[in-house]
Amino acid sequence: GEMCDALKDFPEAIDNTLRIAEMCNLELDFSKRYAPVYKVPGEKIEKDCTFPSAPKPVEEMKDDERYLRQLCEHGLEWRYGTRDVSPEIRARLEKELAVIISKQFCSYFLIVWDFCNYARANGIPVGARGSGVGTMVGYLLGLCNVDPLRYGLLFERFMDPNRSEMPDIDIDICQDGRQKVIDYVRQKYGHVAQIITFGTL
């Protein structure tokens, strides 16, 4: 073929390419999702942090679920001045966490929280927009500054328990610091892809 003609003086290059190709084997299982994992540093888990409305004991929680709950408890104190919040706030938080946990999305929230924290610590303005603003968990993590209960925002617009699609949290990052945040995510989490959406008329 064309490559053989182009590399006729280097037949071993063609042979080696074929040999490498024959050794490659990739099987992708599209029946399940592959979500990123947030590795919770052991020292970050507070042994004495309690979760008054959690449906199961702490010992049965995965690390990412426990850490997300812990951050939400601190978020209640930050946003409302106390963890002893109204039943309405507590019910909304538990409803959201139940869906997030059942869809194995705790790590995703933690990763977004992590790079937003990094951005703020480096003076880079950052914040959520779109349906992700309608989450109590996002509000408690500081991803956005809109109380979804106060403004009647629906969690289901972001993450419907009856639908299988994976949601995403749209985060706006200041242009001046965006590359620094991307570099941080790439350095910390490894496999990072930049996605673009093209609209057509």
Language model regions located:
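Generic structural marker for isolated residues within well-ordered, non-membrane alpha-helices
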Residues: E73, G134, I182
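Non-catalytic structural connector segments
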Residues: D5-P125, S131
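Conserved phosphate/anionic-ligand binding catalytic regions in large, soluble enzymes, centered on
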Residues: A119, G123-N145, V192-L201
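Beta-strand segments within the central parallel beta-sheet cores of soluble alpha/beta enzyme folds
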Residues: K32, R150-E156, I195-T197
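Short, well-ordered loop/turn and helix-capping segments at boundaries between secondary-structure elements
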Residues: R19, M23-L26, G142-V146, D160, ...
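Short, well-ordered alpha-helical packing segments
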Residues: L18, W113-C116, G138, E156, ...
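A structural-propensity feature for long, helix-poor, extended segments
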Residues: M3, L7, F155-Y189, Q194
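Class I SAM-dependent methyltransferase SAM-binding "motif I" and its flanking Rossmann-like core
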Residues: G138-E165
